[in-house]
Structures are given as C-alpha cells and as structure tokens.
Amino acid sequence: MINISTSPRQTLDWTALKPADGSPAVEWRISDSPVPYPEAVATMEARAAAIAAGEATELVWLLEHPPLYTAGTSGHASDLLEERFPLFTTGRGGQLTYHGPGQRVAYVMLDLKRRRPDVRAYVAALEQWIIATLDAFNIRGERREDRVGVWVRRPDKGVGYEDKIAAIGVRLKRWVSLHGIAINVEPDLSHFKAIVPCGISDPRYGVTSLVDLGLPVVMTDVDIALRAAFENIFGETRAAAPAGI
C-alpha cells in the first residue's frame, strides 16, 4: 500500500528514514567530470532496478551535468523561454529546472520499503538534508509548504523576497527512489533566466547559490557537509568501489 502523509512536511517525522540496525551502508560515489544527462539517467535506472531486485546496495551519486534543462512530469513547454541548452524530459516530479557546472546534483537511490514507504516523509527528509548541509555554512535554509525545495530569505532585495538555493525532484519505482536534489554552489545563475524555474514566475522568488550569498566555498566543502548531514538523517555511508556503478 502506498503511504502518502497529509501532514505539513515540516511536521513529518523524517527521522524514521534510517534503516534497521545491521543494514548495509549506503554507497557514496562522486564523479569528478560532468556526466551527460542521458548517461546519468540510464545508470540510475539500472542501479535502482538492481536495488529493487536485491542485487545491489543503496547508492548516493554526486555529480555535475553539462549545461542543460530538464522538464519533470508537471513541466510545461511555455516555461522554456529560450532554447539555450538541450532540454530533456524526465520521469521525476516537478517542472523545469537547470543543471550545469557549479551545481551539485545528488542522485539518491534508496529502498524505502526498508526505511519508510512514505513519499512526503521522504521529500521532507531530503529537505532536511539540504537544510542541515546549509547550516554547516551558517546559511539558514527553509522549506515552504507551497514550494518544494529549500529557500533563503533575501531582505536585501525587499520585503517578502526569497531565493531558491536547492531543488528537489523525485520518482519512486518499486519503492526505490530515483533522482534527488540539486544545490547551487557556484553555477551561472543567468542560465535560469531562460526558463520559469519550477513554474514560479513571482518576481519575489528568485534563484541563488552559496557563492552568490558571499560564501567562499568549493564543491569539496559542500560534499563533506552533504555526507555528514546525510548520515545523520539516512544512516551510515561507505565509499563506493572505484570502478562501475
């Protein structure tokens, strides 16, 4: 039975996402070179199928993509304002977003049957993972019930202004999660202007990054914070083997 919580995400018990004691550690992989989107999706789909079949352990895969746009299951063609980069349709939830160098994408392949088969609790846990990661850099990230993702307040821009610093888009297949999160570390923010990001056209809601907020961070700093925060929420990790996914 599919379990979908109806409570506000901020009240959900995301701590229940840890697996039972004695479960294998989650593999933690980092790709140093940009990964083409079709290649990433094919690899992710294959790994998720292997996890569902009991033939592979869970995996978190950190990477960057070359510049591109993706349209989720709620995407609208009208939200693509300029055809700057390739556009890929994808099975994740959500609308249009940008991926490119300087953005840390984390594809998360977890078996929620072994954890907690609850879509909203899982999304809340992903949000908490991002919030805890940002906290390591003294950035206060916040969730919004009407806007999935993580936001930072921008009083310097005006009353009620907020910028999105991280996006979330997920898909579940046989209760194994696919896709995941994207945190803006130092991407070219002008590339977001070619789309209506996540369908949000309100001028009070923009896009930002850690570097845009004045943080002198590099991707390695973010990766360290991501792993520590992940383990607090989802459990133990281990470095993936050098070859293969």
UniProtKB/Swiss-Prot annotation:
Pathway: Protein modification; protein lipoylation via endogenous pathway; protein N(6)-(lipoyl)lysine from octanoyl-[acyl-carrier-protein]: step 1/2. GO terms for biological process: protein modification process. Its main location: cytoplasm. Pfam families: LplA-B_cat. InterPro entries: aa-tRNA-synth_II/BPL/LPL, BPL_LPL_catalytic, Octanoyltransferase, Octanoyltransferase_CS. It comes from the Bacteria. Its EC number is 2.3.1.181. The active site is at C198 (acyl-thioester intermediate). One of its GO terms (cellular component) is cytoplasm. Residues 54-238 form the BPL/LPL catalytic domain. One of its GO terms (molecular function) is lipoyl(octanoyl) transferase activity. The record marks K164 as: Lowers pKa of active site Cys. Keywords: Acyltransferase, Cytoplasm, Transferase. NCBIfam families: lipB (TIGR00214), PRK14341.1 (NF010921), PRK14345.1 (NF010925). Belongs to the LipB family. This is Octanoyltransferase.
